[in-house]
Amino acid sequence: CEVDGRYDGSSKFPRGDRFGFFPSFSLGYRISEEKFFEPLRNVVDNLKLRASYGTLGNQDVGSYDYIQSINTQKVMGNYTFDKVSGADYAYADNPVSGALTWEKVIHKNVGLDLSMLSSRLNLSFDAYIRDVKGILTQGKSLPSIYGAAEPMVNANDIRTKGWELTFGWRDSFKIAGRPFHYSLSATLADYKAKYTKV
């Protein structure tokens, strides 16, 4: 059993949303070490069940995307105002969201490891669910007359379900009196992803 926890902070988010706690843990149960498994040990070398749960945070935004900025620029053309050419003017930048926070990734996994025939045959199976919550993306469309791009917001959630099966075989034999080692492996996998919130 292993337990971990991260407490991360980022200045890319506004006060009150800068910190996130991201725990994770994993469990393993080696069935082949149990006493009731002894009759199978001459064939099965290792049989282990695994389970894990983990969370991570993503801060893939600009450094100060939550702060509204005011920019200055020269007036176009060669107009003169009060004997000054190219006068400056100020304008507000694109709108921002004051509630940006961490994009959260939650990964759940169960698995099985199997070794047989003096560890020549190996099999590993994993099934997982991966949820990404509060995906950082552009918000709802603004009217074109507004003249500015949409602010970044934590708008979408996506869920991915999948599995992976790996087979492996390794052995050796002699060629011209010298040992020859070889190994073969194959992997089958599939997954489906869909938005659960848009």
Language model segments and positions:
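Extracellular/periplasmic, surface-exposed regions of secreted and cell-surface proteins
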Residues: C1-V198
